[in-house]
Amino acid sequence: MATLKDIRTRIKGVKSTQQVTKAMKMVAAAKLRRAQESAVQARPYAAKLKEMLGSLSTKVDTSLNPMLSARDEVGRVLVVLITSDRGLCGAFNTNIIKVAQKVMTVDHADLHKSGKVDLICAGSKGYDFFRKRDYRILKGYPGVFQNLDFSVAKEIAEQASGMYLRGEVDKVVVVYNEFKSVLAPNLKSEVLLPITPEGSGDEGGSDYIYEPSPASIIDVLVPKHLNTQVWRMMLESNAAEQAARMAAMDSATENAKELLRLLNISYNRARQAAITTELSEIVAGAEALQGT
């Protein structure tokens, strides 16, 4: 049975941990507000670019732009995985890593077995996980979320599009956490290349007049679209990470509160037992003296 000193030490340790988790929850909440604003602000711009591509694709021969044309056969796949740099965010990284593994080993099982699935990791957790295993990592970006910058998203998009244009890969998939709410992260795997513009059916393209020509505009718009989509996904992941950390720290704080309650009960019981034992010894000693 634990002594009073042991229980006091545990209570002190749990209180210290509770203070840390409570502070981390407050920090995550502040970061979440900023990250959520950035993610929400990026969505309309990304959506409008996609809408414009849908309109343009009805006015030009999409086969003239390789990034708008799906390959007849997919012989090699590039997976871009976005995770966090830090832990203490629940199952945030574990769940998205599982999705990435499924994309590589299940959705593209034959290509994976033949070593034709490449990987780019943005974030330390995904990079650290896959570099210790049998996966082909082309590039890692550990620490990218410590100072999140558009230039990294642009670099990833340019590398992916360059590989696609050179025929080094036939498909690019991005795996990331999309921010929905604090309690409902959305695990996503989106095809970045080839681009499938929304609204490219019979009704697309009637609302815009393009100058100088749709063909010249689409060549400029496609790279902007790719850069923006990768940036949006990184912003979404950052917001989802802060939400997951806030929820995890809130849960840890509540668990610490419950553990303190149980430890206090144990402490009081142990203290009561010690007092009872001392009283019994005193009474027994007094009775022994009276009997002599």
UniProtKB/Swiss-Prot annotation:
The entry's keywords: ATP synthesis, Cell membrane, CF(1), Hydrogen ion transport, Ion transport, Membrane, Transport
Assembly and interaction partners: F-type ATPases have 2 components, CF(1) - the catalytic core - and CF(0) - the membrane proton channel. CF(1) has five subunits: alpha(3), beta(3), gamma(1), delta(1), epsilon(1). CF(0) has three main subunits: a, b and c.
Entry annotated with the keyword Cell inner membrane: no
Places the protein is found: Cell membrane
InterPro entries the record matches: ATP_synth_F1_ATPase_gsu, ATP_synth_F1_gsu, ATP_synth_F1_gsu_CS
Protein name per UniProt: ATP synthase gamma chain
Gene Ontology CC annotations of this record: plasma membrane; proton-transporting ATP synthase complex
